[in-house]
């Protein structure tokens, strides 16, 4: 390779780092996986799978709109070197890519997701293994972010009005979960697309199940908590069964009384037809009149008793069904534990208040997670403020924040004791309040300052959402087909992970990194918007591929030796490029 500007030949690509991205993904088997995805479209000049690969390459080059593939400042379609690095003979016109996205089906999306999972699995396993080896917690961050479209649009499928960016907008909601191994570090695990009126709490279970599927790790299920609910439910069922018996016996007595009265009336009226003394006749008539007067009241009592009995029977049926459901849930969690002999000691679910309800907290706790979240509404905060007194001890946790905490607090809808902390923030001369919620099995809790700062580290996922929008433009929907929209979500998460995941490999591929390159490697946005759109010369030999950035690029003279990264390696053998032989 050459480094002197006077000796520099013409660059043969305008997307230097994108070539490296393609080599990385190709050598790890992702491109081959995408080329096997079923797409119900005939091959003309380019296979439909090629257009999916092109779509991913475009996202990793930072295109803002699909037409940028052709009409952007550095058209990807006109760069055959990039296409070759991504294992293709060339790239198609963006309109052809658009038609392919419209043709994709649920089967296509599922196959793409499977290919991405196979690519991601060793990287996720490496991070998880490292955390568990060091005895550190697994922390999952959950979030819901809006994808707004024009309020007058009628062509986006499944849109709905919902709360997005502090106002009501038309669009979609994107539910995501990431693993946060360290502050400011994240590994996206899954994302789901929903109509705009979807709320966070309804997405929690699918995100938890997706996180477990990706990491292949799950906490010990707390079957003892489910057993507590079973025992409580059995007591409820027993009480209702007693009520049902009591009301059934009462109804039987009323029916028996009614039958007896009718019999007496019939018998007495039969006696009146015979020859009896006038005094006795008058007495019998008085008795019959009293019995007949009592019958309507008795019928009303029977109707009321039957209605009350039916109500208790219906309640008993619901309670018995709930008990059966709890017993099945207990059996399922026990089965989970039998196949999970060495669970991690602590797995945290960190989320904002939108994901929280009594029902979902109960489910999380029984699933073995330790929630770290905020109270779902102001009622909890208001209730806690009534506990304050002049003797309350406030602990400073930040420059403008204090906290005080209570244990064994029961939130509405959750039968298990939680630890809660009241936060106060001074704004002007007044205070504003909020409530944090936490749970740990062993009862050993962090100090309030540690808790405060650890919860606020969930800004990691919020920063990730901003990166999705500012680096990969996920908010600009590049297709109006359901499958195309879901593919954009999948490819955006993949791109964010891959750009970060390939950094150690790129560092080893650059024998003489410059300060500018080092800064770029620490900034996904610079890698995508600057390095992946920088002119370079790519040369291929029998030994491998070498890439040198142009003298007038942001990284003049930087050379990357892109030697083969094996598609499958042990966890401790990642990012080891082969060395070029000299001579």
What are these regions (language model features)?
Residues 1-12, 32-583:
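Anion-binding and metal-coordination hotspots
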């Amino acid at each position: 390779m050459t480094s002197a500007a006077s000796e520099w030949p013409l660059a043969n690509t305008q997307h230097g780092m994108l070539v490296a991205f393609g080599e990385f993904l190709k050598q790890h088997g992702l491109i081959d996986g995408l080329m096997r995805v079923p797409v119900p479209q005939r091959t003309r000049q380019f296979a439909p799978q090629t257009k999916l690969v092109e779509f991913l390459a475009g996202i990793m080059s930072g295109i803002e709109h699909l037409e940028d593939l052709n009409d952007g400042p550095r058209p990807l379609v006109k760069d055959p070197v990039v296409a070759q690095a991504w294992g293709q003979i060339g790239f198609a016109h963006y309109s052809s890519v658009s038609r392919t996205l419209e043709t994709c089906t649920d089967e296509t999306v599922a196959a793409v997701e499977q290919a991405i999972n196979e690519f991601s699995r060793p990287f996720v396993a490496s991070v998880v293994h490292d955390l568990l080896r060091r005895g550190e917690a697994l922390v999952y961050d959950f979030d819901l972010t809006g994808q707004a479209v024009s309020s007058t649009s009628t062509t986006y499928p499944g849109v709905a009005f919902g709360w997005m960016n502090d106002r009501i907008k038309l669009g979609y909601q994107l539910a995501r979960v990431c693993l946060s191994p360290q502050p400011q570090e994240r590994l996206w695990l899954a994302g789901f697309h929903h109509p705009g009126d979807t709320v966070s709490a309804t997405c929690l279970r699918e995100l938890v199940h997706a996180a477990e599927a990706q990491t292949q790790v799950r906490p010990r299920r707390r079957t003892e908590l489910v057993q507590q609910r079973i025992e409580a439910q059995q007591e409820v069922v027993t009480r209702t069964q007693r009520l049902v018996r009591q009301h059934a016996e009462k109804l039987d007595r009323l029916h028996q009384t009614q039958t007896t009265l009718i019999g007496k009336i019939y018998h007495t009226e039969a006696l009146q037809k015979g020859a009896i003394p006038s005094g006795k006749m008058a007495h019998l008539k008085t008795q019959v009149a009293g019995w007949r007067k009592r019958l309507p009241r008795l019928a009303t009592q029977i109707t009321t008793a039957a209605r009350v009995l039916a109500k208790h029977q219906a309640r008993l049926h619901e309670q018995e069904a709930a008990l059966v459901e709890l017993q099945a849930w207990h059996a399922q969690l026990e089965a989970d534990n039998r196949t999970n002999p060495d669970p991690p000691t602590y797995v945290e679910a960190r989320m904002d208040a939108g994901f929280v309800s009594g029902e979902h907290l109960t489910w999380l706790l029984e699933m073995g997670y330790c929630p770290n979240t905020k109270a779902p509404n102001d009622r909890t905060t208001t209730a806690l403020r009534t506990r304050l007194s002049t003797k309350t001890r406030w602990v400073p946790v930040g420059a403008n924040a204090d906290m005080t905490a209570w244990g064994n607090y029961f939130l509405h809808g959750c039968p298990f004791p939680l630890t809660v902390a009241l936060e106060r923030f001074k704004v002007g001369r007044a205070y504003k309040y909020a409530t944090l919620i936490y749970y740990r099995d062993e009862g050993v809790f962090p100090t309030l300052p540690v808790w405060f700062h650890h919860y606020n580290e969930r800004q990691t996922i919020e920063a990730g959402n901003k990166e999705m929008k500012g680096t990969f433009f996920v908010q600009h929907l590049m297709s109006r087909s359901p499958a195309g929209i879901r593919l954009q979500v999948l490819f955006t998460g993949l791109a964010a992970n891959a750009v970060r995941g390939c950094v150690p490999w790129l560092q080893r591929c650059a024998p003489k990194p410059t300060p500018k390159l080092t800064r770029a490697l620490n900034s996904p946005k610079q890698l995508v918007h600057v390095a992946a759109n920088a002119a370079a010369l790519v040369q291929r030999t029998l030994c491998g591929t070498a890439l040198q950035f142009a003298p007038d690029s942001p990284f003049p003279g930087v050379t990357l030796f892109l030697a083969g990264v094996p598609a499958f390696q042990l966890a401790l053998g990642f990012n080891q490029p082969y060395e070029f032989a000299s001579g």
